[in-house]
A protein has these predicted regions:
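Transition-metal
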Residues: 1-139, 201-227, 251
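Short acidic-glycine-tyrosine-enriched beta hairpin
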Residues: 157-169, 284-304
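His/acidic/aromatic-lined binding-pocket segments of jelly-roll/cupin-type domains
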Residues: 87-88, 96, 118-121, 159-160, ...
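Double-stranded beta-helix
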Residues: 132-155, 185-227, 313-325
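C-terminal amphipathic alpha-helical segment
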Residues: 195-267
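Ligand-binding loop in jelly-roll beta-barrel domains
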Residues: 80-82, 90-95, 104, 125-128, ...
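Short, structured patches in soluble enzyme cores that scaffold and shape functional sites
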Residues: 100-102, 123-126, 135-137, 148, ...
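Short beta-strand segments in beta-sandwich/barrel cores
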Residues: 260-262, 278-283, 297
Length: 325
């Protein structure tokens, strides 16, 4: 089964920047894109195939057609026709709302299959870029309620200056916000459940404020502080370097200036590549070839056992790789 590209869903947001527009070389005058949903099976937001025999098919339709060949036997048994991950580029000119996501158990009570554990990999920053991940100290539900009422909750959050290459793991229940000036790749469980705690009193084009979910957020939040919210990893050129490993996904960083081989024989899962620098010719174990350039994402079927990555031109090729462990 051949590698698959999808048409990204471009989302205009009140906080969106221009980094996605530039990376994807969108036409001049295109409204700022805050989010690009690269690969999605979220109902109502399914990405569609851009070429080949399955041109125009949605991701859920592909799973129905190919089953375990596409997603892996264990994934098909566990998730059925529901694709378990959602892949995005995010560009923020203004801070996103302070928010939290539910875990699987809470999401199930809402009738949804997944909570939302996610991670961020920073691929670009502007002056003063920072983000919020977690509380600066142990907090409590009562203090949270008071902090929301009097507006002091921001004083209790852990803020982090960001740089290209930074990685943050955001488990369900952790309060967080992407700050202005960040351009990042987000890998998350396939869920659109977000509980907004505070949205900086912003209004949309019609003058309306976005809905807050203060009580649901209180139920979802983990109020215990961590000592270090950054994810530390060691990256080397020409290798698939581990960044995040959790029950929901494994994510590795691939950067190379020459042809490299990646072995997937032991992985019973689809593999997603999200390219953010350069261009490469990819050749799978069956000899299928495809070009992948910065701003594009690719789904490798679980039936594929290996991949050759050959950078094109004189630039380095860099991508984030993720799959289900």
């Amino acid at each position: 089964m051949k590698p698959i590209k999808f048409e990204a869903l471009l989302k205009n947001t009140i906080w969106g920047g221009n980094d996605i527009n530039h990376l994807k070389q969108l036409p001049e005058g295109t409204k700022a894109v805050g989010e690009s949903w690269e690969i999605s099976g979220v109902p109502g937001n399914e990405t569609i195939v851009t070429a080949g025999d399955d041109l125009g098919a949605t991701l859920p339709a592909l799973i129905r057609k190919y089953g375990a060949t596409l997603v892996g036997a264990e994934n098909f048994k566990r998730y059925g026709e529901t694709f378990p991950l959602l892949i995005k580029f995010i560009s923020a000119a203004q801070p996103l709302s302070i928010q939290v996501h539910p875990d699987d158990a809470m999401a199930n009570t809402m009738g949804h299959p997944f909570g939302k554990t996610e991670m961020w990999y920073i691929i670009g920053t502007h002056e003063g870029a920072r983000l919020c991940s977690g509380f600066a100290h142990d907090y409590s539900a009562d203090a949270y309620t008071q902090g929301v009422e009097d507006g002091s909750i921001e004083e209790h959050l852990a803020y982090h200056t960001t740089h290209v290459g930074d990685c943050f793991f955001i488990p369900a229940g952790r309060i967080h916000s992407i700050g202005a000036g960040n351009f990042l790749i987000e890998i998350q469980q396939s869920s659109n459940d977000t509980f907004r705690v505070y949205d900086f009193n912003r209004t949309d084009d019609l003058g309306n404020r976005r809905e807050l979910h203060v009580e649901q957020a209180r139920q979802a939040l983990n109020f215990k502080a961590e000592g270090d919210y950054r994810t530390h990893y060691s990256a080397r050129l020409g290798e698939a370097s581990l960044m995040v490993q959790c029950p929901q996904f494994t994510t590795r960083l691939i950067r190379t200036e020459q042809t490299m081989q990646v072995d997937y024989a032991a992985i019973d899962s689809f593999v997603i590549l999200i390219a953010y620098e350069g261009e490469a010719k990819l050749t799978d174990a069956e000899g299928n070839e495809v070009l992948l350039q910065a701003g594009e994402s690719l789904l490798l079927p679980a039936s594929n056992s290996a991949l050759a990555i050959e950078p094109q031109g004189i630039t380095r090729f860099s991508c984030v790789e993720t799959f289900i462990p």
